[in-house]
Each structure stands twice: as C-alpha cells, then as structure tokens.
Amino acid sequence: MSRGLGDVYKRQIQSNMFTNIITYVWWDSNSTCYLYHNKIKRRRITMGRKIFISYKYWDDDVYPVPRFSDYHPKVRDYVSWLEDKFQNRTEHYYKGESDNEDLSMYSENYIWDKLKDKMYDSSLTIILISPNMKEPNKWEKSQWIPWELSYSIRKTTRAYYTSQRNAVLAVVLPDKHGNYNYYKSMRLFSILQANIVNGYIPVVSWNDFKYNCDKYIDKAYEAQKNTPEYKLQINI
C-alpha cells in the first residue's frame, strides 16, 4: 500500500488472537514512525528522513574534509561526506544529486525540473552556508540557493498528493582556516536571513552538526512545527 506525501498512514502489522493485542505502525506527514498497540501507549521510533541539500558547489574557501577533499577542497566535499554518512551510518535518505551526476550540459529549465523532483520527495532541506555561497554581482533571483529554499518551504501539489513544507536546517561550514567568524558579518540571501530571524531555520556549526546530526535535524522539525505559517517568507 502506497503513501502520498503529506498523508498520515497507519497499517496493522500484527494481531495476536490469544492476547487480543493488535500492533500498528504509523507514519506522520514528516515521515516519523510510531509503533503502538491497543494495550500500551504508542512508542516513537527514529526513522530516516528524506534530505535535500542546498549548497554552492564550487566555493573553495572551505576547510578540507578528511577522506573527501583533495588538494582543492570545495563545498561539494561536505555534501559527499553527508551522503556517505546518511547512506552508511544512519537511516536517512539523501535526495540530492550525486557528485558524478553531471547536469552541466542541460538547460537551466531541465536542471530546475530535476531539482524540484528531488525536493518534492524530501521532508528536510539542509542549507550549507559557506563564505562565497552568495555571488555579490548577481541578483538573488539569478542564483540557485534562494529558489531551492523557496520551493522547499512551499506546499506543492502534484496529481492527488501534496508535499508539505520542508523543515530547514542551516549548517555553517568552516572557512579554509577552520574558522567560523565570517558568518557574523556575512550578508545572507534575503529569504534565508528572514526565515532564520523568524525562527523557522535553526543554525548550527559544522563542527557541532557532524557529531550529532539527529539532534539538530530534530531541532529543524521542532522549529517547523512551532513557527506560525504567516511568519514565513516564501518569495525571493
């Protein structure tokens, strides 16, 4: 039985005729799973999230990532580290593009359609903040990250299913000297800054996040739940 995005889905998985206990599995709209039966209170289980990552691929003013950076470190190395962690050491699912997935030969419209497909099938967007993520001489509407954030926090309906707004977490990466001081004076994209200020997007340093991903992922979902919809800035 399939489950549409944004739906609540419950399924009976076990029934014991001798004890009259019926066990159910329950997913909510954020893909959080619960197990419960009719004799005890339901119990929450940590389940994998579908995660999209928004970042500036070629920003090279970042600290090297062990095992993933060569002589020319770049932000993509952090994405590869997270992709490896999610796939091999957690229950989370990485929904972004792989490093060997070259879309440069395609039109921007085609690339945007592919990105929207990935974001539609996700429930959390992680934005990697790096020193040069924002190009100073280009309009914000001409850069990918604001569009990815805007799409992530919209409710989007396709056919019979509606994808709810993603939770969003901003992770500040260390610069090439291993410092985070640049973030204090950095001019962020307007849509990102506004949704940090209104409480929708928690911010964490890479050093804290990499050792306790689930803690900060949960914080993003809490912020999503606790921030009134009217406070969100959705447009770029």
Language-model-detected regions and their locations in the chain:
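Conserved N-terminal substructure of TIR/SEFIR domains
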Residues: 15-124, 221, 225-236
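Conserved TIR/SEFIR loop-to-helix hotspot centered on a Trp-containing motif
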Residues: 132-158
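Conserved acidic residues
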Residues: 6, 123, 130
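Single conserved hydrophobic/aromatic residue that forms the stacking wall/gate
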Residues: 1-12
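Short beta-alpha junction loops
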Residues: 131-132, 162-179
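Alpha-helix termini
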Residues: 89-91, 155-164
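Short, flexible/disordered intra-domain loops and linkers
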Residues: 60-73, 135-145, 181-183
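C-terminal interaction surface of TIR/SEFIR-family domains
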Residues: 23-24, 49-50, 57-63, 172-236
